[in-house]
Amino acid sequence: MTRFIDRVVIHARAGNGGNGCASVHREKFKPLGGPDGGNGGRGGSVVFVVDPQVHTLLDFHFHPHVVAPSGKQGAGSNRDGAAGTDLEVKVPDGTVVLDEHGQILADLVGEGTRFEAAAGGRGGLGNAALASRARKAPGFALLGEKGESRDLTLELKTVADVGLVGFPSAGKSSLVSTISAAKPKIADYPFTTLAPNLGVVSAGEHTYTVADVPGLIPGASQGRGLGLDFLRHIERCAVLVHVIDCATLEPGRDPISDIEALEAELAAYTPTLQGDSTLGDLAERPRAVVLNKIDVPEARELADFVREEIEAKFGWPVFEISTVAREGLRQLTFALWDMVAAYRAAQPAAVSRRPVIRPIPVDETAFSVVPDGQGGFIVKGTRPQRWVAQTNFDNDEAVGYLGDRLARLGVEDALLKLGARPGCAVTIGDMTFDWEPQTPAGVDVPLTGRGTDVRLEQTDRVGADERKAARKARRQSGDE
């Protein structure tokens, strides 16, 4: 029998970007061909896509690692590396994606809904793209960025029009099996249903879905029984139906007390759905009461006795049925369709949103420098950390290019203001190195006060009059 898995923890890792290529164009009669290294390809991303043919998270239970392909390295003759193909992962309709802290990242409802779970790394630039007037033939290229890697939790919340709630062995699975083609497991012991069962019900020319979920017991909102595993699957149901066992022999139970106990658990749970505010809390959903097992004479008498009291106390429609004798089922299915149709009519019409592209604002203060408490400094920021990760520290020219970029960004000025001295340890990302200040041209910066230059304060320079006097003295000595 196929296992139903509705909660898994997976590790999604996007592909790395390809490295750029450092090469020089070689051709006959062209001694100065110039750089022609291509850029690296972008890494593939991990994308979740809703597929109506997928109904469980079972595949992720056995294969929790999802890895997208990396981009290819650039080549000579200005050939860019191939980009990694995005890995489209099919998930069931109603999947909720949470991060490692339990925050909801996406609520995937509707066929074709997509969510980028992990972004692929950008490819490194080749030396052809790095060429400039100041650096006409770079002897280096940038490395590709690492792909995003994260741990995610996937939760499946059943998407159905009608949800059946009730105590264990109330006849919910039997009801679904008689009004639809679903074949759930049915037995005469509690918690026979361990996973939700979906059935498609036909009411004349109309169809809707019904979810049979595990039985509810007092304390389910705190995790007793199947607890939250049950309650999570009724969050998306537009109509809730209380299935009441009128033939139970358990002491202290009757239809009204069962309904009150079920409502107490729903009120204790009452999660407000994020991203689907039209449904609201569970207390706001339309309800119906089904008095089951009236094929038993005592149960029929009890149902007739409490029906008016239930309608007067709760104000919900009440139906008396027997799944064994198939009595009252047609009236129930059409009544549920009327409730579902009323809910669908109340929903706002879907409006296609025009995509709006907004440029990312440029943050001039995209970094911060803080002392590390040991005489060194830590530079934090998206751009400095990305630049360091793309630098090949085995290439001196690449290291110099990194220093130029950091200087233009203002990192060196910030270090000087904090009292950094040459040789102190500076940490950027995962790299720690000895800092040596430099100008974009590679000349050491004199550590003097602003507005002064020791090269202009030298007083031993020979002037024009002194040079003229020296020449005159040499001529006189030659005449003698």
Swiss-Prot record:
Residues 359-437 form the OCT domain. Its main location: cytoplasm. Residues 441-480 are annotated as: Disordered. It holds the Pfam family DUF1967. Its EC number is 3.6.5.-. Residues 469-480 have a biased composition (Basic residues). Its cofactor is Mg(2+). Gene3D superfamilies: GTP-binding protein OBG, C-terminal domain (3.30.300.350), GTP1/OBG domain (2.70.210.12), P-loop containing nucleotide triphosphate hydrolases (3.40.50.300). Residues 160-341 form the OBG-type G domain. GO terms for cellular component: cytoplasm. GO terms for molecular function: GTP binding; GTPase activity; magnesium ion binding. Transmembrane segments: none annotated. Monomer. This is GTPase Obg. The gene is obg.
